[in-house]
């Protein structure tokens, strides 16, 4: 949008540094091509522009670097040569699989995985075993409890979330509860699956109302903000979510991640596992919850790939002309061009 302004050159010609975070989410699709074209335009205005790409889940780092900084501008200084910097921090990653009591009776088809609901409930309970009941009048701003032990409740629950947090046939639990143990993220692959699991957890444990939440892209910003504040403050026991919490989150209270169904790739598995133990020296942990028997095989393959350090490569699309046309229109709007 900024590049489409008629005065784009005036405002952006002096940009010195561009940081592209989570480059793995862009490099393999047309959004990544748009980023490449935008960076090329900025480099044309300022040949000394520095570009940094950041990623923790790419199997083909040299290719990803060459895609982000493909060629040097004609007037670029020698020190602008692309450089690959890799961290040497050993990050412990623990992968477990939640198995049914009788594997031979496990379903061969399905995508919800609700047959493992009792085991999931036990896992969440074990991760956050202590709850302290608070009076609603104690609610403050969602900040973490003070070091001296005074407790704070989460920020006021938005009206929409208060309705969805009420289990069928029952009222929402009175008061706010402060989760003293670690929080759990339950990742699903679709919004409908997330909503079904959220409702199933409330039906199984009505007393958890107000301490578990739902997070996906169709919810309002107010609701998502409340959930994220509760995670940061450590006031939520569990959050059922989609890819809306894959990136850009740093919730230290999260100690456990459950993946309902297939993660659809080793890179995404690593990304979601990293939501737990999100600090140097801490162990990231993820538990795979298969929805049918074939996913048991996939879980075993994912564990083996992680043990061998293998992550999928991501390749940029070849000659997406529609993106080029869109970029040319952007240039035309942003001050015009000379064919």
Residue map of PLM features:
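Helicase motor core with emphasis on the C-terminal RecA-like subdomain
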Residues: 3-335, 339
């Amino acid at each position: 949008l900024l590049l489409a302004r008629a005065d784009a050159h005036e405002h952006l010609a002096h940009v010195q540094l561009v940081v592209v975070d989570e480059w793995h989410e862009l490099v393999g699709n047309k959004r990544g091509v748009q980023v490449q074209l935008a960076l090329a335009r900025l480099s044309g205005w300022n040949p000394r522009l520095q570009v940094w790409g950041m990623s923790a889940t790419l199997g083909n780092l040299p290719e990803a670097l060459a895609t982000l900084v493909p060629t040097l501008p004609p007037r670029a200084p020698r020190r602008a040569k692309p450089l690959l910097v890799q961290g040497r921090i050993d990050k412990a990653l623990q992968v477990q699989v939640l198995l049914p009591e009788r594997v031979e009776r496990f379903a061969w088809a399905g995508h919800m995985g609700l047959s493992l609901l009792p085991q999931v409930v036990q896992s969440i309970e074990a991760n956050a075993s202590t709850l302290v009941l608070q009076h609603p009048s104690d609610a403050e701003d969602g900040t973490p409890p003070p070091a001296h032990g005074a407790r704070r409740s989460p920020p006021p629950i938005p009206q929409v979330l208060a309705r969805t947090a009420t289990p069928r046939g029952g009222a929402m639990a009175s008061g706010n509860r402060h989760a003293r143990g670690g929080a759990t993220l339950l990742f699903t692959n679709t919004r409908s699956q997330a909503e079904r699991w959220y409702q199933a957890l409330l039906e199984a444990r009505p007393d958890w109302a107000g301490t578990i939440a739902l997070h996906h892209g169709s919810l309002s910003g107010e609701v998502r903000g409340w959930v994220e504040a509760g995670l940061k403050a450590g006031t939520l026991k569990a959050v059922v979510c989609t890819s809306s919490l894959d990136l850009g989150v740093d919730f230290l209270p999260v100690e456990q991640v459950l993946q309902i169904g297939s993660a659809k790739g080793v890179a995404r598995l690593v990304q979601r596992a990293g939501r737990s133990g999100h600090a140097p020296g801490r162990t990231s942990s993820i538990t795979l919850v298969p929805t049918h028997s074939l996913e048991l095989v996939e879980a075993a393959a994912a564990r083996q790939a992680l043990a061998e350090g293998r992550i999928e490569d991501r390749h940029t699309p070849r000659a997406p002309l529609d993106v080029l046309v869109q970029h040319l229109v952007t240039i035309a709007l942003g001050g015009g061009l000379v064919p």
